[in-house]
Amino acid sequence: MSRIHSTQKKIAEAKRTSMLEIMVWFEHEHETLSRLALVITGDIGAAELSVCKARELVTNGTSPFPFRKQLTEWLKRVTIEAAITSSLHEIARCESRYRYLNCTHSEHLLNGNDSKLRQFRNLLLHIDPEIVIGELDPLARAVAILRTTGRASILDCILRLRLSLDTVLAANCRAMTWFAEKRTGLSEKAPTPGQKLEKL
């Protein structure tokens, strides 16, 4: 039995990526990773530093590397984490904007596998980051990236951003409303929160 277990373990480990493969893939996915980091940080320099930090975290990490088929999404998550960590102060400063706002759209509480979130993710990966930065604040951008690319739940966002439920729900509403406007082409600019969010 132990021999079978040992063989299964070796097969599983063989499917995991090596450090060399990860470093090569960091270079291969650099443009995408930098784009994600830029949407979160709003600054090219900070975005590049976030990608570098993600690479350092991977290099110094002790946890098992992902399986090869999970590598791309894993690198995105590590980079998103690094970018959010470097932007927590700017994100927290946006909290007051959502203090008295309330989301009444049940469709905004979608899980990470929903087709609309996948469409939103594709939009964020292809639209000019400067448009996103110019039309959404750091908090809404962070929630948008976490919910779409990171496939985070609302609770995950609360824990990661260290903000209240009401704040995250309102920021999520802002991001989802912006996406709806972009998807349907109703407006060149996202509406202000007061147009789509109801006051308590």
Please state what every model-predicted region is:
Residues 30, 48-107, 172, 176:
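Σ70-family region 2.3-2.4 aromatic/basic alpha-helix that recognizes the −10 promoter
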